[in-house]
Amino acid sequence: MKKLLKSVLVFAALSSASSLQALPVGNPAEPSLMIDGILWEGFGGDPCDPCATWCDAISMRVGYYGDFVFDRVLKTDVNKEFQMGAAPTTNDAADLQNDPKTNVARPNPAYGKHMQDAEMFTNAAYMALNIWDRFDVFCTLGATTGYLKGNSASFNLVGLFGTKTKSSDFNTAKLVPNIALNRAVVELYTDTTFAWSVGARAALWECGCATLGASFQYAQSKPKVEELNVLCNASEFTINKPKGYVGAEFPLDITAGTEAATGTKDASIDYHEWQASLALSYRLNMFTPYIGVKWSRVSFDADTIRIAQPKLAEAILDVTTLNPTIAGKGTVVASGSDNDLADTMQIVSLQLNKMKSRKSCGIAVGTTIVDADKYAVTVETRLIDERAAHVNAQFRF
């Protein structure tokens, strides 16, 4: 049985090193691996000893914490219906019979959409308070940065197409978008911002060199969106440090997307994650491989902020946006005609929808190398609900 357990854990550890896949599971035996300190010797006494004191029971560890999520499995968390203008019909020809001015409930193209890519990289300081070489209470303080990419439907990219309203009357018409642009890509990069986490880990059961342990962790961060890219043939644009409207319904203010816009706020993403895990390790001299399972929930909430396409406050050369003509036929209609804006996408906007975990369960495999019972380095890989790698280097005082 011992040989089988050794084989399984060693294989798992070696596999993790060869396939790097935002919270780590960690080694379940970590509270009891470093039993000596660089400044004070370990006590290693009995908690039931009446002569033992809290000074004997408590020790500190500090170190580096690096967590690198290459692909978190996420999906949107939105309602089934979305409020916007009515879709054009076959009765509409060169332009709309009736320009949309009121919102109607339409199927939400963002409902249940999967994100194509979600990355997060964290570098932090690690601090752990150890009790009786069995329990750890720890925290991390550092910085994180992220990247998100998905189909434009996930971000409710919408615009107005086919309007017959004259350009001279457009600013006062209070029209709403009627087209969902679902065949495009939206990506965003966040800035590097403060991140923190807290957690606890316990070695629940020990038998010889084997240890079964459990942990619970919570992490939080709120990065701002540094750059937003919309890759769409009908309306392609990039915004650095985007701002938008929170809680605003269509129509947005006609100044949205211009330098004169008011009532906007910076686009930021509130990241929360909590995780519970159970893991098994087996010590082989200085190596302690382990394998674990975890259950976690993560959310990325940007308050459903609506961000408008950049445009000019006043037309220059009869142009306010750089959106191309779409029909690809006919002649350019003179400015002032009824449908001079019908062939370009107008009042384009998107919103940053709330996202959550698409899969809650995952596995982690890793190994810890301990030197002189004072220093340790842990390398870990996580799979299924995310592809991630974790590195932790620490020492005991």
Swiss-Prot record:
Signal peptide range: 1-22
Main location class: membrane
GO molecular function, one term: porin activity
Stretches that traverse the bilayer: none
Membrane-protein topology: Multi-pass membrane protein
Gene Ontology cellular component list: cell outer membrane; pore complex
InterPro entries referenced in this protein's UniProt entry, alphabetically: Major_OMP_Chlamydia
The keyword Transmembrane is assigned to this record: yes
Keywords, in A-Z order: Cell outer membrane, Cell shape, Disulfide bond, Ion transport, Membrane, Porin, Signal, Transmembrane, Transmembrane beta strand, Transport
Localization per Swiss-Prot or TrEMBL: Cell outer membrane
Gene Ontology BP annotations: monoatomic ion transport; regulation of cell shape
Function: In elementary bodies (EBs, the infectious stage, which is able to survive outside the host cell) provides the structural integrity of the outer envelope through disulfide cross-links with the small cysteine-rich protein and the large cysteine-rich periplasmic protein. It has been described in publications as the Sarkosyl-insoluble COMC (Chlamydia outer membrane complex), and serves as the functional equivalent of peptidoglycan.
Family of the protein in this entry: Belongs to the chlamydial porin (CP) (TC 1.B.2) family.
Self-association state and partner proteins as the record states: Part of a disulfide cross-linked outer membrane complex (COMC) composed of the major outer membrane porin (MOMP), the small cysteine-rich protein (OmcA) and the large cysteine-rich periplasmic protein (OmcB).
Protein name: Major outer membrane porin, serovar H
Protein source organism: Chlamydia trachomatis
